[in-house]
Amino acid sequence: MGQFSSPLAGSLNSIGQNFLPSQTIETAQANRYQNTALGEVEYSFSRRSAFTLSGAYGILHFTTPGYISSHMVSTQAGYDYQLDAKNSVAVLASYARIDYTGTASPTEGYAAELAYGRKITGQLAFQVSAGPEETSASRPGTGGFRNLTLAANSALTYERRRSGLLVSYSRGLTGGSGVFIGAISNTFSGTLHHQFSRYWSGSVNGGYAFNSSLVPTGVAATTFTNWFVGANAGRRLGRHAQLAFNYGLQKQDNPAVCPVVVGCFATGFQQSFGATLNWHLRAVE
């Protein structure tokens, strides 16, 4: 959602990612499923300007009792103008509504952002957007409240023929990862990828997430912090299949009192290993 529609769009694509279901807070062992449907239309007024309208619907549903399931509807409109071959500006407006299963406590967010993107060289590009975000929420026992905060996104990308680097930051309203009824999330992340050969590829990634509960102004928020690193190696199998192996290491700092009765993610370092096999109807390029 919310991408620049100018020629920079290929590398400048992190604007507006907050209005999607996210899980930057780890839970204890629990079964869940998450799905997102996205759509986008664009109308070009000229070679240098365009209007983009996008929408999304996402669900985060826990089959393990005790966590907060949610579904989100969001939309974003943006006008993008290419100043020259290297610089673009955009005006973005976003809206999201999050409903939580079993409660009558929806959360809504309205954001307006100014965005700037620059193609520094043929391989290096940068983008940033920022603006006010108003969140409104209703909570049993406390009634409704409104907060005004900052929404922001930025990304730096570097791409070569066989390698690439992405460093990004985002801040804004999120669903709460099944632990909070709404949260303000700050996420820093970086990914480095490389194509070793026609068949083998790999990547490493890392980041930091800081999440705080959505509460009225003046009330102390509950917070989680999460550090994570990972690595992935993949191999193409023929023209239609890919096999990948991955490893993750993370550490989460929990609040003194866990917000959900079923318990929070274990403190200290946690490791994960996995393998995936993907098959595509179309031949893999």
Which role does the model predict for each range below?
Residues 33-39, 73-77, 89, 93, ...:
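Hydrophobic, lipid-facing positions within transmembrane beta-strands of outer-membrane proteins
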Residues 46-48, 82-86, 119-123, 160-163, ...:
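Outer-membrane beta-barrel channels and translocator barrels
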Residues 41-43, 81, 118, 156-160, ...:
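Residue-level signature of outer-membrane beta-barrel architecture
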Residues 17-25, 59-63, 96-100, 135-139, ...:
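Extracytoplasmic loops and strand-loop junctions of Gram-negative outer membrane beta-barrel proteins
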Residues 1-3, 57-61, 95-99, 108, ...:
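Transmembrane beta-strands of outer-membrane beta-barrel pores
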Residues 1, 51-53, 89-91, 126-128, ...:
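Transmembrane beta-strands of outer-membrane beta-barrel proteins
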Residues 233, 240-242, 246, 268-285:
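Outer-membrane beta-barrel "beta-signal"
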